[in-house]
Amino acid sequence: MRKIWELKKKEAQKEKNASGISPAQIRIQKDVTDLEIPSTMSTSWPDPIKLNVLHLEIRPDEGYYKGGKFKFRIQIDDNYPHDPPKVKCLNKIYHPNIDIEGNVCLNILRQDWNPVLNLNSILVGLQFLFLSPNAEDPLNKEAAADLHKDPQGFASRVRTAMKGGLVNGISFDNVMA
């Protein structure tokens, strides 16, 4: 299996050298062209020449996080689509699947990733985290336990955190739109 991976890397490097554009860049261009951005999201590129870094803003219109603006950075490396993009939440938020450092727990960004998935898949997955947080597979175990044991209290603490308040002694970013 390792030999196959090494051969694929060599082939990709040959293709890049021949055309000046890597297979990852070609795939990223296709994914960007195929993006279907709902009204609750917006995208931007810090450098329009380099499509491998994407900024995403999610504005949920329902659920616990309704009314917030959540910013993400999506970084795509040269092994894409064989490796998933790296996604980081740029806001400090109270969420079972996003820790206070901004790391995101989404299965398609880890063990469930495969090369047929694309940027649209990631956007849909991130949006779903805000509509239906998953307490069964958390990064923020306190928030997950809170959601599981006391959904109404969790909702109240999410609102407090979204307004830039303190939850369990931790200060969160004001993300209210």
Curated annotation (Swiss-Prot):
Domain of life: Eukaryota
Keywords: ATP-binding, Nucleotide-binding, Transferase, Ubl conjugation pathway
The UniProt record lists the keyword Transferase: yes
Catalytic reaction equation(s): [E1 NEDD8-activating enzyme]-S-[NEDD8 protein]-yl-L-cysteine + [E2 NEDD8-conjugating enzyme]-L-cysteine = [E1 NEDD8-activating enzyme]-L-cysteine + [E2 NEDD8-conjugating enzyme]-S-[NEDD8-protein]-yl-L-cysteine
GO annotation terms (biological process): protein neddylation
Cross-referenced PANTHER family: UBIQUITIN-CONJUGATING ENZYME E2
Annotated protein name in UniProt: NEDD8-conjugating enzyme ubc12
Annotated organism of origin: Schizosaccharomyces pombe (strain 972 / ATCC 24843)
